[in-house]
Structure formats: structure tokens, C-alpha cells
A protein has these predicted regions:
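Alpha-helical multipass membrane-protein architecture
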Residues: 1-567
């Protein structure tokens, strides 16, 4: 781990070629992340994917260090969670009929405000979480280990881009040409969308997440669709429409309960320690620990001025008013701490839950139009998403000995580029497909945004939501993944089934690798090395399949917009 009081120079880490590669990758990953989040209701961390391709391209251009690759992938992945923050909140306004009240400029201001607040907050909390508390940040740690494993090069590039090409071509055949169907094995079950979604991306998500977590996801799907909708209607307890409302309410309650439980169990007990740690840091820091300017005093001024500027901008440009703007700005700093703690301990960043919490707090203090509440949730979700990404990158940098200031500057570059791209993609998608394409059982399920919309407009079944909320809290305390179960309850069954099939492929893949190693009679050291290479190959191919379909989906959306503009 790097020592912040004796950090390495930025020379050779934040480079021109790295910035160019990072920005190009950021554009692609941000666009595909927005599409993935809307289409699938989930967004896997892109850090490992970005790390692999960053090192690959840098090596094509000559010698490259792991530190340069670390900074490059920091730039490259920055926009993904900005896109996630928008995709998990803003489409809720489209579902409620407010699409014509949200412009591209509004979307960009929301993304930019969240990005800047997230950057300022992480400059403050970096030392506490990475150095003093030294949290695990499993995704960031995995990215560092992946860079080390990939350094030797080899077949990585061919595997990655070959799988991307296959998924991209397949997506064109399915979505543009209609040669292959979107759904397979469809069954007519009242109230249940039973099918296998013909999607390399969703299969890859199941593969990347792994069998055990997706098994809980699928269990939730079975409970909601066959336990409540099929079983409940067969028993005459309620009709199909009522059952579907119950399922949505239960799923939302489970996810909300999980988010609140994370705050209650893991965040609040740490807040006092975090504040004490930050205060202690401020008395002992040197300018070497500055991440923004190289001077702690100048950093303090920049953070204060930047925070005030964002409060003024959102108050005027988004018409939130002074009191809501101040509340949003202050609570965003609190929620980024929550986000960092959650990512550091669990690898999960429930950004939309944090957005919901602040949105409800603001709604209690101010009378705002519903569409404005989505702006608030979006700002907070973007800030928390970016904070999670930044802290994971900082963890990878600590493992590899990268200069954290170089990383922070890279994150600022990628975050601002990501805000531009994410806003453009969101507007392009709603223009191409129309606001009616977003929501449960629609082309873009936008599960998290649907939760936000429901919290704004009302809950179908308050008792079931309350029951799910309580169950989510209890389950988290018992170590049961309520978020995954709630996601399965909430999402259409065809998505859960397809992801489960992908996780089954991962289970078979791991068992085959173990059987092969056992038959080979390898030593423990050779077995570990071979298994690491095998796992990396699976990661690269699955990431390529996911990225290929995502990128093509965005390209098709832009083509559709272009054709509509041409008449």
C-alpha cells in the first residue's frame, strides 16, 4: 500500500496517452453503462473491465507501468457510475409523464452537480477510508490484482474484442434486423413474463455476479412470480393486477429495507469515528496529502467555493430554491461517506437508496414539484455512484502504489466527460424509444428509477411495502442478501431466469476448472496460477459479451435518433 506521506511522483502515471485512451474508453463505457442500467436494472462495476483494456492499449503504444494503467482505467471507468446515477433516478420522471419537462441541459446539470460534489467529498475522505480505516474495497482490490495478472499480455486483447464483436453482431441481428428472436421458450402464464431473454449481456451479468448471489436473486423471482402471482391468484386471495402491485411493493420494500439497514448497521456506528478521523487528519496533514491542488489550504478554499457554487447553480438552474439546494448539498457529503463505507465493506453501492433518502428529507422541508424531486435524487445518486468508483480506484492505487492525486485528477477528467456523455445518451434513448418504453415489463425496465417514481407518486400496496421494508432490515442483520432477493421479486421473471442461467454457466465453468486441475496433478502453486489465468479468461470474455451488446444498443439508439431527425 502506498504511504500518503511519501507518495510517488505523478510523472509517468498521469500521461497524455493515458488521458486520451481513458477519455475514449470513458465515452464508450459511460454510454454502454447507461444502456445496461436502463435495460437490465443493474450495473456491474466496470473497473476491472476498464483495467484490462487500459493496460492492453497502453502496451500497444510501448512500455507501460501498472501505475499508468491504474490512472488510465480511473479515467475510463469514472463515467459509468455517473450514468448509473442518472439511469437509476431520472427515468422515473418519464414514467410519470414529465419527459417534456426535463431537457438535456437539466440532465447535464444534475450529472455535473453530482459529479463535482462527489469529487470534492472524496478529496476529503480519501485518507480516512484508504489509509486509516484501510477498508477492503473488494472491487478495487480485484482490479489491482487483475492488472498484475494481465501485465504479461497474451491472448487478452483477442479474447476481449472477439467476444465484443460476437455480442455486437448478435445484437444487430436481433434488434436491428429481426433475424433472431428477443425471447426464447416463452410460456403463457397469466401475470408472469416467463421466457429466456436472448441476450448475451444478461447471461454475462449472471456469469460475472456468480452463482450464489444470483441464486438469491432467482429465489426472489420465484417467490414473487410463482409464490404470490400464480399461487396467490390460484388460491383466490387476489386478482392478477392486485398481485402484481403487491409484488412490486414487496420488492421495493426489500430493497429499501436493505439500504436503510446498511446505514443503520454499518454506517451510523462509524460516523463519529469518521468525523474524529477527519478532524485528526486535518491537524497532522501536510501538503503531500492534498489531492486537488497540492496545497491543503488551497484545497480547503476550492472545496468551499465549489460546494457553494453547486448550491447556487442547482438553486437557480434547476429551480430548487435556496433551502432545498443547501440541504441537498450538505446531505450529499453525508451520503458519499455512507457510499464509501458500504463499498469498502460490502462492495455494494446502493446509490439510488441514498438519493431516495435525501429526496424524502427535502420533500419534508419544502413544497417542490414532483419533477424537481427527481433532480434531487439524481444529484445524490450520481455523487454516491462516483464516490464508490473513486474509492475503489483509490484502493487499487494503494495496492499498486499509485499517486492518489494523479488518480483524483483522472477521476475529475473522466467524471466530467461522463456527465456530458451520460446526459446525451439518456436523452437519445428517450427520444429514440419514447417515454413509454421505460418501466416495469417495458423495453427498459429501469427498476431503480421505477422505485423512485413509485416513492414520488405512491406505493401500490403500503402494507406489503412495509412488510418488505421490515423484512429487508431483518434479513440484512441476519446476513441474508435482501437486495438481491428484492431485485428478483421486482424484476420481470424473464430477466431473472436468464441471469440465473448465466450464473449456472459460471458454476459449471468453475467446476470444470477444478476437475481439470485435479486430473492434471499440479502442485498447489501451479494450480493457483492456472486457476487465476482461467478465471481471468472467463472474466474477459464475459465482460466483452456484456460490453458488445451494450455498445451496439447505444449505437442503434443514436442511429434511430439520427434517422428520425432526417425524416
Amino acid at each position: 500500500m502506498s504511504n500518503p506521506s511519501n507518495r510517488t511522483s505523478m510523472r509517468g502515471q498521469l500521461t497524455l496517452r493515458g488521458v486520451v485512451i481513458g477519455i475514449l474508453g470513458c465515452v464508450i463505457i459511460t454510454a454502454s453503462s447507461a444502456y445496461t442500467a436502463l435495460k437490465m436494472g443493474a450495473l456491474p462495476w466496470p473497473i476491472i473491465f476498464a483495467a484490462v483494456i487500459s493496460l492492453f492499449f497502453l502496451k500497444l503504444m510501448g512500455n507501460a507501468s501498472l501505475n499508468e494503467a491504474n490512472v488510465t482505467h480511473t479515467i475510463m471507468s469514472a463515467g459509468a457510475m455517473v450514468a448509473g446515477g442518472l439511469a437509476f433516478t431520472s427515468p422515473g420522471a418519464w414514467m410519470l409523464g414529465y419527459a417534456d419537462q426535463i431537457s438535456w441541459l437539466d440532465m447535464f446539470i444534475v450529472a455535473l452537480a453530482g459529479t463535482i460534489l462527489g469529487l470534492l467529498a472524496t478529496a476529503l475522505i480519501h485518507r480516512h477510508f484508504i489509509v486509516d480505516a484501510a477498508l477492503e474495497f473488494p472491487t478495487g482490490n480485484a482490479a489491482a490484482q487483475t492488472l498484475r495478472a494481465t501485465e504479461a499480455g497474451g491472448k487478452t486483447g483477442k479474447q476481449l474484442f472477439g467476444s465484443m464483436a460476437i455480442a455486437g453482431i448478435y445484437s444487430v441481428l436481433r434488434d436491428a434486423l429481426g433475424v433472431v428472436p428477443s425471447m426464447l421458450c416463452t410460456l403463457n402464464i397469466p401475470g408472469v413474463t416467463f421466457a429466456i431473454y436472448n441476450s448475451p449481456m444478461l447471461l454475462s451479468i449472471g456469469f460475472l455476479v456468480g452463482f450464489a448471489p444470483v441464486a438469491f436473486w432467482f429465489a426472489g423471482a420465484l417467490l414473487g412470480n410463482f409464490g404470490i402471482i400464480v399461487g396467490g391468484t390460484a388460491a383466490g386471495l387476489f386478482d392478477i393486477v392486485t398481485a402484481q402491485g403487491i409484488v412490486k411493493s414487496l420488492g421495493m420494500g426489500l430493497m429499501m429495507g436493505f439500504g436503510v439497514a446498511v446505514v443503520l448497521k454499518d454506517i451510523l456506528p462509524q460516523v463519529a469515528g469518521i468525523v474524529r478521523g477527519l478532524a485528526a487528519d486535518s491537524s497532522t496533514d501536510t501538503d503531500e496529502q492534498s489531492l486537488i491542488s497540492g496545497s491543503l489550504k488551497l484545497d480547503a478554499g476550492i472545496i468551499g467555493l465549489g460546494t457553494a457554487a453547486i448550491a447556487v447553480i442547482v438553486a437557480i438552474a434547476l429551480d430548487l430554491g435556496p433551502v432545498p439546494a443547501v440541504i441537498v448539498t450538505l446531505f450529499t457529503f453525508v451520503t458519499t461517506i455512507m457510499s464509501a463505507q458500504s463499498c469498502g465493506q460490502t462492495g455494494i453501492d446502493p446509490m439510488e437508496i441514498f438519493g431516495l433518502i435525501v429526496m424524502l428529507i427535502v420533500a419534508a422541508f419544502a413544497q417542490l414539484a414532483q419533477v424537481k424531486l427527481f433532480f434531487i435524487a439524481g444529484i445524490v445518486a450520481v455523487a454516491c455512484g462516483l464516490a464508490g468508483d473513486v474509492m475503489n480506484d483509490f484502493k487499487a492505487g494503494a495496492v499498486l502504489g499509485t499517486n492518489p492525486r494523479a488518480q483524483w485528477i483522472g477521476q475529475a477528467i473522466g467524471g466530467i466527460v461522463g456527465a456530458l456523455v451520460a446526459a446525451a445518451v439518456m436523452v437519445a434513448l428517450v427520444t429514440a424509444y419514447g417515454p413509454d418504453a421505460f418501466g416495469p415489463d417495458k423495453s427498459f425496465v429501469a427498476a431503480q428509477a421505477s422505485v423512485v417514481a413509485t416513492m414520488v407518486s405512491g406505493i401500490p400496496s403500503v402494507p406489503w411495502f412495509a412488510g418488505g421494508f421490515i423484512a429487508g432490515i431483518v434479513m440484512y442483520w441476519l446476513g441474508i442478501p435482501a437486495m438481491m432477493i428484492g431485485l428478483g421479486v421486482y424484476l420481470p421473471f424473464y430477466m431473472s431466469l436468464t441471469a440465473f442461467l448465466g450464473s449456472c454457466v459460471k458454476l459449471a465453468y468453475d467446476k470444470w476448472a477444478a476437475h481439470r486441475d485435479a486430473e492434471a496433478g499440479l502442485s498447489d502453486e501451479d494450480k493457483a496460477a492456472k486457476d487465476a489465468a482461467f478465471q481471468e479468461q472467463g472474466l474477459v470474455v464475459a465482460s466483452g459479451l456484456l460490453g458488445g451488446e451494450s455498445v451496439v444498443g447505444v449505437i442503434l439508439a443514436f442511429v434511430s435518433v439520427g434517422l428520425s431527425l432526417l425524416g
